[in-house]
Amino acid sequence: MREYKVVVLGSGGVGKSALTVQFVTGTFIEKYDPTIEDFYRKEIEVDSSPSVLEILDTAGTEQFASMRDLYIKNGQGFILVYSLVNQQSFQDIKPMRDQIIRVKRYEKVPVILVGNKVDLESEREVSSSEGRALAEEWGCPFMETSAKSKTMVDELFAEIVRQMNYAAQPDKDDPCCSACNIQ
């Protein structure tokens, strides 16, 4: 069974913990309690292949930003979350993706861009097209979720597993990876 380390990143209050807890336990956290860092483990079967996810729910506040490099270094897949009802959180997500590329020294890191709180449609500040355009620019999947209504939560974690499974395959076009069996 494959084990993957998934890191959930985003500004404070965007719903990182709510998404993670909804996926792991099936419950919604009503009260906002800023996270420093929390680890969760969950088995998941995607495309008939079982995996264990070790999910790191990170702090969104700037005072813990210095810890991000370490999280990123150890992560294999990244869920970048912003709130659909907070334009600033959408702007804040861009440097986080840049930080992933800088730390990993690789452009094709498994990343999913997530607009959360789709249940608050009437308060929306970030359009779907803005999210899609950014995901297209980054070459990654884009999803809109709601931890509260459990919209696309399981699909989100299944998709990051697919992205990590794909990234774990040797690149047939890369002479380095096809010349040897190192994975």
Swiss-Prot record:
Binding positions (GTP): 10-17, 57-61, 116-119
Result after altering K150R: Reduced NEDD4-dependent ubiquitination. Increased binding to RAB40C. Increased localization within endolysosomes. Decreased cell invasion
PTM summary: Ubiquitinated; undergoes 'Lys-63' monoubiquitination and diubiquitination by NEDD4. Multiple lysine residues are probably modified. Ubiquitination requires TNIK, prevents interaction with effectors and inactivates RAP2A. Ubiquitination by the ECS(RAB40B) complex leads to RAP2A localization to lamellipodia plasma membrane, activation, and regulation of sorting at early endosomes for recycling to the lamellipodia plasma membrane.
CDD domains: Rap2 (cd04176)
Outcome when changing T145I: Imperfect binding of guanyl nucleotides
Glycosylation (residues): T35
Catalytic activity: GTP + H2O = GDP + phosphate + H(+)
Cellular component, GO annotation: cytosol; midbody; plasma membrane; recycling endosome; recycling endosome membrane; Schaffer collateral - CA1 synapse; synaptic membrane
Alphabetical keyword list: Cell membrane, Cell projection, Endosome, Glycoprotein, Golgi apparatus, GTP-binding, Hydrolase, Lipoprotein, Lysosome, Membrane, Methylation, Nucleotide-binding, Palmitate, Prenylation, Ubl conjugation
Keyword Flavoprotein appears in the UniProt entry: no
Swiss-Prot/TrEMBL GO biological process terms: actin cytoskeleton organization; cellular response to xenobiotic stimulus; establishment of protein localization; microvillus assembly; negative regulation of cell migration; positive regulation of protein autophosphorylation; positive regulation of protein phosphorylation; protein localization
Propeptide: 181-183
Cysteine methyl ester: modified positions: C180
Subunit structure: Interacts (GTP-bound form) with RUNDC3A. Interacts with RGS14; the interaction is GTP-dependent. Interacts with PLCE1. Interacts with ARHGAP29, SGSM1, SGSM2 and SGSM3. Interacts (GTP-bound form preferentially) with TNIK (via the CNH domain); the interaction is direct and recruits RAP2A to the E3 ubiquitin ligase NEDD4. Interacts with MINK1. Interacts (GTP-bound form preferentially) with MAP4K4. Interacts with cytoskeletal actin.
Function: Small GTP-binding protein which cycles between a GDP-bound inactive and a GTP-bound active form. In its active form interacts with and regulates several effectors including MAP4K4, MINK1 and TNIK. Part of a signaling complex composed of NEDD4, RAP2A and TNIK which regulates neuronal dendrite extension and arborization during development. More generally, it is part of several signaling cascades and regulates cytoskeletal rearrangements, cell migration, cell adhesion and cell spreading.
Domains (record comment): The effector domain mediates the interaction with RUNDC3A.
Protein name: Ras-related protein Rap-2a
